[in-house]
Each structure stands twice: as structure tokens, then as C-alpha cells.
Amino acid sequence: RLHMDPCWTNDPTKKAENEADISAFSMARYRLYLQKLYIPLIKDAIAHGLYVIVRPPGVCPGDISVGDKYNRYLKAIWKAFAADEYIQQNSGIISIELANEPVRVHLSDGSNSDKALHDYFQPVVDEIRAQGFKGIIWVPGAGYQSQYQDYAKHPITDSEDNFSYAVHVYSGWYGNMTDKNCNHNTFIRNFKSQVPMVETKPIMVTEIDWSPEDPDKA
């Protein structure tokens, strides 16, 4: 999993508050370092026999809305990435994770709806396919990539039928697990409830940790 780190894509003359702040983002720098850094890193990983999942620079702001500045940012990032000749030639090995850890996703007017996730990410999928990229697209959910129920009602559609969902798995998100209270069946039941498409589609876990609370007991 390659993070196109914003320390390269941000204009050094501008100050970004955190990785969710895209005010310092420079498309010119992104295009430059896509060629000078990110694609060479991808090539090196492939030379080592790895498949590469690429995520965009930074993380989602806590609240995002359909058609907002961050939505346009994701479309611009992936439009440039998906149009690249090398990326297209290696689309069987390189896949795209649309965003990192959306938290709360709203309609364009800021209201809540079970259509918001679909309406936010469907246009990003469409933008990628419009460039001719045919590789796998991994779609994130809400709640830091732990909530996917809304996609069961409003699923993503894909002209290539070559997409699924990227999920983050931290034990507390699927049943408040602790060292003293960890039940595999509870975890599995909650995971199936929160990520219902796990029953019908291959799921990619792009972050996972189950470290003991007391590291001396590891």
C-alpha cells in the first residue's frame, strides 16, 4: 500500500494544518513527483514481486459533502494518475484505493443520507474509468473505513465490473474488543453487519492492527 505522501505534493511556501488540509496542495508538484517518486516506488515494488495499492495524499477531513472541494480534489488526483501510460499498462498489478478514512459523509447540502457515500465516490470511480484505467478500484466506507451498510442500499456501479471495498480493521471497531474481552464470533458477526458485501465480494483490508494493550504480553 503506497501512500502518495503530501509532504511531496504540498507547496512548501504554504502551511497545511494537518494531512486533511489540502489548501497547500499543488497539482504541478503532484504531477512532478508522480513521475519522479511515486511511479519509481511502484516500479521497485513490482520488481520485488509485489502488488501495489495506491492511496491519495493525506486523509479525509472529518466531514465531507458530495461535490465539495475534497471531492473535486480526489477526482483531480485520480484523473492524473489513471491517465498515466505506465499505470494503465500495469493495471493488473496496480490498484487504486479512492480515499483514506472518510469519517462522516454528507449530501451536497450537508444533510445526512444513506445515498451520500454512493454519491460521493461514484463520480470518482467514473472519472478513473473515463481515463481508460481498467484495474481494480477499492472503495472506502465511512467511520474511518468501518461502515459500509449504505452501499448495500446504493451500491457503486463500475463499467469494468472490477471494483470492491477497502476496509480498515481495528479490533475495537467491530465489537469493542479488549485483551480480556475478545470473542471471535462477535467480531465476525459485527464485521458482517458493518461490511455486508463481505458475503458477496472480495474485501481488501488496507489497515489492520490487533496489538495487545500490554506489549509485554505480546
Name the predicted role of every residue range.
Residues 1-60, 73-75, 117, 122-132, ...:
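Aromatic-lined substrate-binding rim segments of carbohydrate-active enzymes
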Residues 65-95, 99-218:
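Extracellular glycoside hydrolase catalytic/binding regions
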